[in-house]
Amino acid sequence: MRSRREFIQLASVSAMLLATKSWNAVAAKQKLKTEDLLDFDSKGQVTLLHLTDMHGQLKPVYFRPPSENFGVGKFEGIPPHLIGEAFLKHFDILPNTPLAYAHTMVDYVPLAMEYGKLGGLDHTTTLIKAIRSERGDDKVLLLDGGDTWQGSYTSLQTQGADMVEVMRALRTEAMVGHWEFTFGQDRLKELIDKLGYPFLGGNVFDTEWDEPVFESTAFFEKGGVSIAVIGQHFPYTPIANPSYMVKGWSFGIRLEVLQKNVNKAKKQGAEIVVLLSHNGFDVDQKLASMIDGIDVILTGHTHDAIPKGIRIKDTLLLSSGSHGKYLGRIDLKVKNGKVVDTSSNLIPVFSDIIPPDPDMTKLINKIRAPYQSECNRVIGETETLLYRRGNFNGSWDDVICDTIIRERDTEISLSPGFRWGTTLLPGQKITIDDIYSQTSMNYPEVYRIEMTGKMLSLIHI
């Protein structure tokens, strides 16, 4: 791996951003320079920044992109359902470059050893502060796409309080959720009260009164432009997770409700309408073709990292990856109350290149201090690459299932095909932190039951 000093010589990040083609070209020669990192086609009066699916990760991580990402029907063979060489070709990314490493599994291990980990919220903070400085603080809106509070040892021990504290320090201005609901309704409400910004979601209704549980929309003025942010929580939460955790609440996509909320926002003077969504990429692609009046969809849930926004009719759709690996950015120009131009990019947060923000580092260290000894406790070493991410299982799932078979004396073991969970390279130590990045949840029970072959054949994960 390049040394920190070499990386800093290659790139200082006083501000940042890289337009895909220009950065890709210089990266092929391994000559990243400051001007390349600063290169972004800034436009208009407004900048949207998007973080999503961080799954409790405060520190830099390895996170291997998928080996499979199957699309169904008309979604087959198009983003985000492209992997490896097909992904590189579609987005005009040269192999063996930083972008190729950030976005595909091609030659993942040697490239990971060269370019290092990505993410770490203190490194992301450096980028956010640089963009705010570049654009002007009054033009930037930072939004959180959910699945933020769950997924690590510290998030489990603090029941989400660690991530709430950090996201407040980042000056986040709105969020939506999914795994946030698995803390239970009482804890969810406690954490929402501590946020200091709205937990938006117009698609969750009280089953007794058939009324919205959360506010649907928040208005912001940035760069003299009125922006409406409409929230969409994960619509299948009671199916994907235990329904008792959201008792009395009904979830769904609710297209009619969403269209009404968009129309209402327009009538109230919104010049930009943003859907902050945890629907998943394919659902939001379909939604964008059915709902009128949405300018931008910032999508999450499926962990797809798309290098730039994809336009569907009049809507720009951006998916900003997961685990803190990326920061999404969209600039918008508004004229006569309408969006007339946009520029978008997904910024890989290379932690060996981007210096950490000292204040955020101090906060993260303070949060982790009571748990540091246990987090760092080594329980083994991996001989092979351990990862999760695809539609089905990864090698971490194999380890978990093999362990359950051995410890619970079973013939078959089943594990949900989660997409969250960080990666370990061959030869790395396995720590408690690593184990909890795969297993941290508020309903961790393992059940041993008898099943017939017919029952097994009916299971869909």
Feature map (PLM): residue ranges:
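Conserved small/polar residues in nucleotide/adenosyl-binding loops
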Residues: 459-461
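Hard-cation-handling environments
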Residues: 355-430
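Flexible glycine/proline-enriched surface loops and loop-helix/loop-strand junctions
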Residues: 314, 383-388, 440-443
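Active-site loop ensemble at the mouth of alpha/beta enzyme cores that anchors a bound cofactor
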Residues: 423-445
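Acidic, metal/ion-coordinating pockets
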Residues: 2-13, 18, 23-352, 359-360, ...
